[in-house]
Amino acid sequence: MADWVLHVDLDQFIAAVEVLRDPSLRGRPVVVGGNGDPTERAVVATASYEAREFGVRSGLPLRTAFKKLPDAVYLPVDHALYEAASADVMAVLRSFPVIVEVMGWDEAFVGVTVDDPAEFARSLQAAVLSATGLHCSVGIGDNKLRAKIATEFGKPAGVFELTQANWVEVMGHRPTSALWGIGTKTERKLVELGLSTVTDLATASADELAARFGPRMGPYFRGVAQGAGDTVVSATPWVAKSRSHEKTFQQDLASLDDIRREVVALAHQVALDVVAEGRPAVRVGVKVRFVPFFTKVRLMKLPAPTSSADELAAAALVVLERFEHGRAVRLLGVRAEFSDEDVEPKPSPSTYQ
């Protein structure tokens, strides 16, 4: 018997749930985002595989998606529906003698001790499909990093194993962006250092990486390229680190008074979540997306922890003054962050944080 980490990832989760609700959507390009109106300002939450064939992906502006694929079915986001479907899937996983660490609506790590992890993974897939009608891919690894990356090779609805034994063979020749946690910006910086592949990064000078990315992130990137990762799967309930609200405006805001008014309204919404959380906020952040699509975030530490809507709003206005004004605004957001100390566990997340 051996200890394994499995990464369970529901395939095109949101789109798949919408197809379960309306089977007539099966096989059609489905795009979910915002209020379902592709002429409004919002982004794609998810797209079915049929829509992805036309270049429609999560995070793409809905208007851009509509230009690429005007004949797709556009649907509004239904948080309650996806939350319920996710809970059903996690309940299936917990029915096995395993440890389940929920990572979001559509994914979880599973810790298990078995002789044949691939066979066990297929039994998980069958159980999830039978109980919920949803397909999932499963990555198998000797740590979380490898299991997470393995899932990408198993999509859709497949199983793939990635361990120390086959890490170099599978990953060595791939670009560094294939690694979990390395995005396109970091990839470009690595290329500037002559590090194009995973093997390049894994064998790079630790001192050189530390000089370019800092003493913490430099060695971290090198470790990721070597496949190093956490092996512990924890069932400890997820705890929110912050609460936030954002609003995208269909008409740009040009007046500073209008911007202030919206920030106060968002802060009051956030305060309701802070009170419900039962923990005071210690920091307040404001996010501003200027026209055409330039985003900045500012953050400040509060003089004292608070759950007061008025105090959070006042702090948000102070943060707002740290931005350079003069450009029209298309999106505003307010975030309240909690202290990491004396945290009381809460139920697992129902939305991405």
Predicted regions and their residues:
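A generic structural motif
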Residues: 107-112
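Generic non-transmembrane alpha-helical segments
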Residues: 88, 92-96, 123-132, 189, ...
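Long, highly charged, low-complexity intrinsically disordered interaction regions
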Residues: 114-177
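Residues that scaffold, gate, or flank divalent-cation-dependent active/transport sites
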Residues: 1-105
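DNA-contacting surface of Y-family translesion DNA polymerases
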Residues: 7, 178, 186, 191-331, ...
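Short beta-strand
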Residues: 100-104, 138, 278-279
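Short acidic, glycine/serine/threonine-rich loops at helix termini
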Residues: 17-19, 42-45, 146-154, 233-236, ...
